[in-house]
């Protein structure tokens, strides 16, 4: 059998467009029959069946090459280092509301992801929205000075999942089962799934100069992101840990944060290559306006505790300008 991949084709000085993929799961092995149009590649490749061993659809070695596996052995669940990492992440989320893994992706992999994002950034949808911190529209049932009436403006561009090439590093990382399993163990989920939404499952938030994301709570309990590119200035991730609770009224504290007077507002330093697991449902957060000509890229990897989860058509339309 001949192994065919976009990387392999590029190394041979050729360009391949993968048009059709059928995958058949056999335990942890996925057999891919790939019909490809191949340009300037040896004729021997044409018409052959390609047999590749994948875990969760992505070659283990290619996924591993993207991360600092010595520092973050997410592929070795029986190792002492893995268990130590799990304990540290759980502690950080409980204590600080965030587990930050700097240098999770290697410098080369991070640069690769930035370049691959550069390739499609012109296709990003410009999302402009005014909302309150609960991601709701204005509700005149509350007084004008109520936190639910205090509008926040968010302005960013969004690259959708279906705009990310299956050969891109970010796509490979997201499809890697070992990463999915690692995050599930950190969060103590018996079952965890990649989001089924063809637009929202994996996205890149793009922030040019002047763009920002206003104060808000996430709808998801936990969000997983990867910093791909940091701006020259601004674009700072700020949050107030555990501001929202299911059993208390947090409006006074929300108002203090909106007035920039809350004593617990923290700026989280996130360098390119950092994987962040963040409890955004309970922690109010924002991204300050970007300054300078370097565009900020942050990928969001969406996982759910139930299969076949899609965003509503309204949410799809807001963030991607279309539905799917």
Name the predicted role of every residue range.
Residues 236-242, 246-324:
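Catalytic core of Fe(II)/2-oxoglutarate
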